[in-house]
């Protein structure tokens, strides 16, 4: 019996195969991978630390309200999702016209990571984008100061929250300590924040501005799509 020196009795070394990543079409066609709305909501609740099945409600948004969260229905682009920086359910329409709801849990430069049935699938944005017409749903947590519009001339804790959150985002404080008055300097900062997030720069802290500000409120429990540098946080 012949053999290479020093190899007698050595166990065979197996090289593991690189796992094959299924295409988006294969994922959508797989009956074992649910793409219904409830499954997407269940995955989204998990990202926020909640068990979807433990709550009652006709819709996912009704269940979200029970834990103090709100639904945000919007139509936008990948850039909008990056700015929002929250996991989001996107609606895809396949070539047969069937609608699928999938949870996006991460965005990098060229790829989106989808969470389906507990498995993560990283797919090119260009592939997902062919079936995505911009519709998405995200959850957000309103600030403790409430959801009422905040505007120039107002005073109170809600104004201080706006100042603190803008400072956390990276805009310089205009008063020290933080003033309770919403003055013209703060209005200018709100407009700058709105422009950077492609919002109407009216200086009014309404729903959409509150939603985006909440992404920088410092809550450790809120899930994010990407790291601060990837999200464009200054």
Please provide the spans of the model-predicted regions.
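Cysteine-nucleophile protease catalytic domains, especially the papain-like/related folds used
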Residues: 2-92
